[in-house]
Amino acid sequence: MPAPSTTLLIEGSFSELADEFAQYIDALRKTEPSLQAELSPLLEPLRQQEQSDAEPDRKQRDEVLKKLVSAATVLNTAPEKEIISAYNLLVHLVHHASDPDMFLSRICSYLAKPITSSPQFGPSLAISILSTIFNTLPATDSSRYHVLLAIVAVIRQSAQGVAFEALKPQLTAQLPTWLAAWELDEDEAQRLHLAIADAAQAAGDQELAQTHVVQALQTIPAADASKKEARDLAVRALTSALSHPAVFDFTPLTASDAVQALRTSDSTLFELLEIFTADTLDAYEAFVAATPLASISGGVLAPAADALQNKMRLLTLASLAASTPSRSLPYATIASALRVPAEDVEKWVIDTIRAGLVEGKLSQLRSEFLVHRATYRVFGEKQWAEVQGRLMVWRRSLENVLGVVRSERERFIRENLQAAQAAEEAAQGKSGDKKGDRRQRRDQPQQSQPAPEAATAVAAE
């Protein structure tokens, strides 16, 4: 898989290595005329330049490489243990060309084909060689585009889920950077996205496949939106999104010029998109009754009839939850909107929660769903009116709460003042009582004490 930069360490001059590679090709082909003999007149001037340390003739090298690369198709028949080293030698030689890209794209096309000498391990060998090529190129080199295409093609043809899983993190983290660095045009970017989508689909990753189909759709210029190729891609993206169980946001599709062009070329399919974008199960069932799925765009959606109806139920419940002012949905209301038995309501609510469309709590005791959060499928004038209504309700509630808080605050202050006043009066009352007692004691005359003599006399008696 693509990784940090790699350097191939191969000893020898260009002429020596080219002659050695030609001998190897002759050994594999076992036919006449000899490639080595054909290259000898071209290699001799290069050999002399190398010996004299003169500047090599790049045009002469390119002529040699043209013959070597043309004959390299035979490498896919080489013994399994020799394939990697043989291709590495060829890649090393190609890096001496005036424009390596004109040769690397052809080498990549060879590696995208089956390696007949190793049916079992051929894809792994090809991916290993292509990864080496990719990593020997500078990060900004547009030649990497052809190499990545070949890697993705090998993975798709071999249906190697493990190989795709190894490549997937690189695609997620690096692909936008690569595309910007390579400066691809719309056609090249579209081709790469579709190749990745095909590989992801072969590996069973429907979500990533859908993502890259939509990205491929976004590369179509507005001027080309009505062309057959654009129409085919728009139909593919739309049918994939409608039938995919995890795709509920259709905004990227409705924003595409190619999808908008379906309003003319495939009006019933576009009408179905509008229903899934903003309408409910009632509208969907009425549409299907009047326009069977088998009659829409060649019947591409007919096999997904059950999946479409199930998705429409989830979307309907999301719309119902989003438009309920009280944030409480009785089971009976849900059952009626979804056309399901009352005993199945909780199952559908749970499925909608798992899809990330709503959040809330089921109350079996009260037979209702308490909505905490709901996803708006579209957000227009109606939704703004709903938001305004809810904000007004919250405002009135907050005003009531604020009134209660103010009343309680005033009561608290009043009671504190009264308590403080009472405490002060009580303190003043106690102080007055103490002063009166002291005054009373001062005003009372002191009792005379008996004379000592009298006391003594009494004691004597």
UniProtKB/Swiss-Prot annotation:
Highest rank taxon of the organism: Eukaryota
Q: Which PROSITE patterns does this chain map to?
A: PCI (PS50250)
InterPro entries according to UniProt: COPS7/eIF3m, eIF3m, eIF3m_C_helix, PCI_dom
* UniProt biased composition (Low complexity): 445-461
Where is composition skewed (Basic and acidic residues) in this entry? 431-444
Where does the PCI domain start and stop, copy by copy? 205-376
Q: Which GO terms describe its molecular function?
A: translation initiation factor activity
* Alphabetical keyword list: Cytoplasm, Initiation factor, Protein biosynthesis
Naming one, the record's GO cellular component terms include:
eukaryotic 48S preinitiation complex
Query: One biological-process term from Gene Ontology?
Result: formation of cytoplasmic translation initiation complex
Region (Disordered) residue ranges read 42-61, 422-461
Where in the cell? Cytoplasm
Q: What family is this?
A: Belongs to the eIF-3 subunit M family.
The record describes its quaternary structure and partners as: Component of the eukaryotic translation initiation factor 3 (eIF-3) complex.
Q: What the protein does?
A: Component of the eukaryotic translation initiation factor 3 (eIF-3) complex, which is involved in protein synthesis of a specialized repertoire of mRNAs and, together with other initiation factors, stimulates binding of mRNA and methionyl-tRNAi to the 40S ribosome. The eIF-3 complex specifically targets and initiates translation of a subset of mRNAs involved in cell proliferation.
Name by which UniProt lists this protein:
Eukaryotic translation initiation factor 3 subunit M
